[in-house]
């Protein structure tokens, strides 16, 4: 295990293994976000079973994704990859007529060295439908990094010329990260109140409406797991990244807006009052967790942002387990975490990259946190040991960005604690961790 000290934050790295939800699950929210798309996941039966269970979409609902199941002939190279993928894509074009087809590579395509990037341009030219290749294998990527690889591939497809004149009063700003439409509207309106116009969003609702990206444009991310997309936008598209904390919680949202305003030399107005009003409205939830402790085992790369928000709510964060940490992309978030700990006068949590779950269980046994935020695999065993847990995957699918959605975060965090209080009040102490 390696340990790195950085500005009073302690970074550790343990096993080098990923203990996370599979990154191909990004299909579940991206196919809904990009309305004219079709996602083709190229993998084995295991991938198919996972998608069926993770998404829970009935087959007669005709979702805009499918599984290209690799068979013995594919793995032994007896079948022609181009011919098989051509047959599937022509069928997709005939049945669904999408504006774009995404090929999602898996662990198996990585192991057998299937040349998806080489096949895609030839097939795209033949069938006249854009084919975007993204690797989302669990060997190299953690849970939410599946979205990162898709957006990084899409960033290279964004147009570079305007068909209408840009009338923005400032250098265009493009935001990146997949969020539900109501949250997108909220964040766009918050920036508009400060006089900042959002020129585009990656991903857009339709592939045919991808934002124009030119050299010198500003870009800002809304999620902490999009480091590859940020790198692609800076290096390939020559944009300027606004390094801001992420708009998760009232404190993060205010800091995100203030940082963007500072880049455009705009003095933000009303943010302090807006943040205070939100905190006041959350007091009924905060009272339940103030003074309690939380331990993050690590799963979705949202851990640092959530830990910072919960620290501001009065919780003590013992450890932040995280599958992968890009310290440059998350520099502003880490700085805000440090200043939050200083303001709240609490200890700095240890950040453990690629944590060893066995070691974590030992630390949980010693520390006895009031709540453990963990992947689904460990929730039931921890509950059996009398430890309150919350699935980290729920934070991925919930609306947690912006000022008004902070209540949803606390709704999730406090649910196990409220459940125990309710059981105790009913006299069912045998089922309660309070008893």
Swiss-Prot record:
Binds 1 [4Fe-4S] cluster per heterodimer. The cluster is bound at the heterodimer interface by residues from both subunits. One of its GO terms (biological process) is light-independent chlorophyll biosynthetic process. One of its GO terms (molecular function) is oxidoreductase activity, acting on the CH-CH group of donors, iron-sulfur protein as acceptor. The keyword 4Fe-4S applies. SUPFAM superfamilies: Helical backbone' metal receptor. Gene3D superfamilies: Nitrogenase molybdenum iron protein domain. Keywords: 4Fe-4S, ATP-binding, Chlorophyll biosynthesis, Chloroplast, Iron, Iron-sulfur, Metal-binding, Nucleotide-binding, Oxidoreductase, Photosynthesis, Plastid. Belongs to the BchN/ChlN family. Protochlorophyllide reductase is composed of three subunits; ChlL, ChlN and ChlB. Forms a heterotetramer of two ChlB and two ChlN subunits. This is Light-independent protochlorophyllide reductase subunit N. The gene is chlN.
């Amino acid at each position: 295990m390696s340990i790195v000290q950085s500005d009073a934050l302690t970074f550790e790295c343990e096993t080098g293994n990923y203990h996370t939800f599979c990154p191909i699950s990004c299909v579940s929210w991206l196919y809904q976000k990009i309305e004219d798309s079709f996602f083709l996941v190229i993998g084995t039966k295991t991938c198919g079973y996972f998608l069926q269970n993770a998404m829970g979409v009935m087959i007669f609902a005709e979702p805009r994704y499918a599984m290209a199941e690799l068979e013995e002939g594919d793995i032994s190279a007896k079948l022609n990859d181009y011919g098989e993928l051509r047959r599937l894509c022509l069928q997709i074009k005939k049945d669904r007529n999408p504006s774009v087809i995404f090929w999602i590579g898996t662990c198996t395509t990585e192991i057998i060295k299937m040349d998806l990037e080489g096949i895609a341009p030839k097939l795209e030219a033949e069938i006249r439908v854009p084919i975007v290749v993204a690797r989302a294998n669990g060997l190299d990527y953690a849970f939410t990094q599946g979205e990162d690889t898709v957006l990084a591939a899409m960033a290279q497809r964004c147009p570079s010329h305007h068909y209408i004149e840009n009338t923005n009063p400032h250098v265009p700003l493009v935001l990146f990260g997949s969020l539900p439409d109501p949250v997108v509207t909220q964040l766009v309106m918050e920036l508009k109140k400060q006089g900042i116009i959002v020129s585009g969003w990656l991903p857009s609702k339709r592939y045919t409406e991808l934002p124009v990206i030119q050299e010198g444009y500003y870009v800002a991310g809304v999620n902490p797991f999009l480091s590859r997309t940020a790198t692609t936008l800076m290096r390939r598209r020559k944009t300027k990244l606004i390094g801001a904390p992420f708009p998760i919680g009232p404190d993060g949202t205010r800091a995100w807006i203030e940082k963007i305003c500072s880049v455009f030399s705009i003095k933000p107005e009303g943010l302090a009052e807006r943040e205070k009003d939100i905190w006041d409205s959350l007091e009924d939830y905060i009272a339940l967790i103030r003074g309690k402790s939380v331990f993050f085992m690590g799963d979705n790369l949202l851990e640092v942002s959530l830990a910072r928000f919960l620290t501001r709510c009065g919780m003590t964060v013992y450890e932040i387990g995280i599958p992968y940490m890009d310290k440059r992309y998350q520099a502003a978030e880490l700085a805000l975490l440090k200043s939050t700990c200083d303001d709240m006068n609490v200890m700095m949590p240890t950040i453990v990259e690629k944590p060893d779950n066995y070691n974590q269980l030992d630390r949980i046994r010693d520390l006895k946190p009031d709540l453990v935020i963990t992947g689904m695999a460990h929730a039931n065993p921890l509950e059996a040991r009398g430890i309150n847990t919350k699935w980290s995957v729920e934070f991925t699918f919930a609306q947690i960005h912006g000022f008004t959605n902070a209540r949803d975060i606390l709704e999730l965090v406090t649910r196990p604690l409220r459940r125990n209080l309710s059981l105790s009040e009913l006299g069912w102490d045998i089922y309660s961790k309070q008893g």
